[in-house]
Structures are given as structure tokens and as C-alpha cells.
């Protein structure tokens, strides 16, 4: 069986650092519980990638967590300053990222920011229940940190002679992160653990079957947004992982950093050109039998 798959009071959050752990910044209110929440999730996610895929990050990673989106950027700026870095992008839109979401999250070089709805009371029950929701999402965002690290993409690189970012395509970046988020849910949390390979494939295929978005649509940086986009990207990366093994999703970014060429990296790892895979994906995304054969390596 394949198992898959009051503002001034909060403004100066206390950082928490540990060996082989992310640098945690969170609010002063309920600081111990929030730090424990983030630290436990960080440890579990790092162990998941190290134990299952031999993937580790030695460079510092900032992990910001808050229940107040209004001060998310203050935490982040303090964390970056402590690390001797500066924010290279526009401030994060905390309201958009966090508002009315059980867990909101985003990643960039070299940080992950997370937020959650403020509960009536902070206690151990809150920590445990929130941790169950937060950890898989952290696995998704930590995948992005691995992608940056493997590709040597901090600061972000450009494709030679263009203004386009080297790291990509967007569906590969987000689809891979979605795959490892799902794997964490299955392998660590036991979600859908009894599903066989066929059921897992069917479940992953369903959102892509409904979406009209193509992989070409999801190639530009930042194009993978919304359920349909994420579902399509997830299935595209999932097929590659089923066909070549999940480790191949990491190998692509490693070779991308060496070759500085998306096409070379993709063909070297998966034995197909991007163009060929885009064509194959359209052929199999709504055909379960064809998708099964492709995932098994029985068809090109």
C-alpha cells in the first residue's frame, strides 16, 4: 500500500532560538504557549524532511507566528534585523494573509510567517488543536525554504538575459509544496492512511479534472493562486512524484541551481521536456486510467 501521499504590549515579541531549529518570533501575550506551538511544529516538520527524505537546512530560517496581523510585519522586521538582513519585498499584507483564516502562512527568503485566529483563551488544548492544523501548513512553507536552499536561490536569481526569476515554474514550486504537505498529513498525522495508491491518485486528480487551468497558465511567477490553481499544480507535481519518487521533486531544484536552466533540470530529472509534460498532463488529467499508466511509468 502506498501511504501518501493591546498593540504596544505585543509589539516586541520574544525570539526563541535553538540548535538546528528555526528562529522563532511571536507575541508577548501567551508567549510561552505560542512559542511552544511553533517550536513543536518546527521540530516535527524538520524531522519529517530529515527522516523521510534526508533534507536539512543549516542556514538560519525565521519563523514568525502571531494572532494579530497588524503587527506581523513588526515581528518580521525585528527578526530580519537580528539576522542582519532586510526585507527585499513589500511589507506583507497581514489582513489578506490572516483575516478569517484558521491558519494563514507565507514564505520567502529566509522566513516563514504564520498567523491564526485569536481564541477565547490560550491553553494547552488550544496549543494541541492548533498545532494539528499548523504543522502540515508549516511543512508546505518549509518546502519552499528547501527549494531556495537547494537551488542556491537566496538572493533570488534571474534567468540569464531576462528579468524572469530562475526559481520556477510556479506550478512546480507550489505543486511540490502541496505534495509534501499532503504527505505530512498522511505519514505523520495518519490522514487517509488507509487509502491505496489508486484512491490517492483519484483524490489528487479530482481538483485538476475540474479546473480549466493549464500548466502554461501556471508557469509565470505568482500565477498559482486559488483552489483550482493549487489543485492543478498539486496533481502535476504528484504525478511526477509517483512516477519518479518524491525525492525527484527536490532533485529538480538542486539541479536547477547548478544548471541555471529550467528545461535542462526538468529533463535531466524526469526524462521529459516541459513541453512534453504539459502535453501529457492535459492528456491524463481527466482520464484516470491514463493517469495511472503515466504514474507507473508505463507511458511517455
What are these regions, as identified by a protein language model?
Residues 4-12:
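Sec-dependent N-terminal signal peptides
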Residues 133, 137, 153-233, 242-299:
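Acidic/His/Gly-enriched intrinsically disordered linker/tail segments
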Amino acid at each position: 500500500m502506498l501511504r501518501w501521499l493591546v498593540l504596544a504590549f505585543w509589539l516586541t515579541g520574544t525570539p526563541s532560538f535553538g540548535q538546528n531549529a528555526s528562529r522563532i518570533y511571536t507575541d508577548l501575550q501567551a508567549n510561552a504557549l505560542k512559542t511552544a506551538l511553533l517550536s513543536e511544529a518546527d521540530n516535527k516538520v524538520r524531522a519529517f524532511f530529515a527522516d523521510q527524505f534526508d533534507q536539512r537546512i543549516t542556514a538560519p530560517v525565521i519563523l514568525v507566528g502571531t494572532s494579530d496581523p497588524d503587527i506581523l510585519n513588526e515581528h518580521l522586521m525585528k527578526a530580519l534585523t537580528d539576522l542582519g538582513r532586510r526585507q527585499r519585498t513589500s511589507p506583507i499584507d497581514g489582513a489578506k494573509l490572516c483575516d478569517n483564516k484558521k491558519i494563514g502562512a507565507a514564505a520567502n527568503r529566509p522566513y516563514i510567517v504564520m498567523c491564526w485566529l485569536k481564541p477565547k483563551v490560550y491553553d494547552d488544548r488550544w496549543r494541541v488543536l492548533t498545532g494539528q492544523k499548523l504543522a502540515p501548513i508549516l511543512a508546505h512553507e518549509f518546502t519552499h525554504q528547501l527549494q531556495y536552499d537547494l537551488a542556491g536561490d537566496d538572493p533570488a536569481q534571474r534567468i540569464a538575459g531576462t528579468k524572469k526569476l530562475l526559481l520556477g515554474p510556479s506550478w512546480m514550486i507550489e505543486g511540490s509544496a502541496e505534495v509534501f504537505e499532503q504527505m505530512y498529513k498522511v505519514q505523520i498525522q495518519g490522514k487517509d492512511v488507509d487509502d491505496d495508491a489508486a484512491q490517492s491518485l483519484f483524490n489528487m486528480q479530482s481538483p485538476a479534472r475540474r479546473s480549466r487551468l493549464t500548466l502554461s497558465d501556471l508557469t509565470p511567477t505568482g500565477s498559482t493562486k486559488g483552489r483550482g490553481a493549487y489543485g492543478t499544480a498539486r496533481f502535476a507535481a504528484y504525478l511526477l512524484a509517483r512516477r519518479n519518487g518524491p525525492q525527484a521533486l527536490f532533485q529538480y531544484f538542486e539541479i536547477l541551481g547548478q544548471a541555471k536552466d529550467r528545461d535542462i533540470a526538468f529533463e535531466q530529472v524526469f526524462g521529459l521536456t516541459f513541453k512534453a509534460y504539459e502535453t501529457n498532463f492535459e492528456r491524463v488529467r481527466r482520464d484516470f486510467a491514463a493517469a495511472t499508466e503515466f504514474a507507473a511509468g508505463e507511458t511517455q
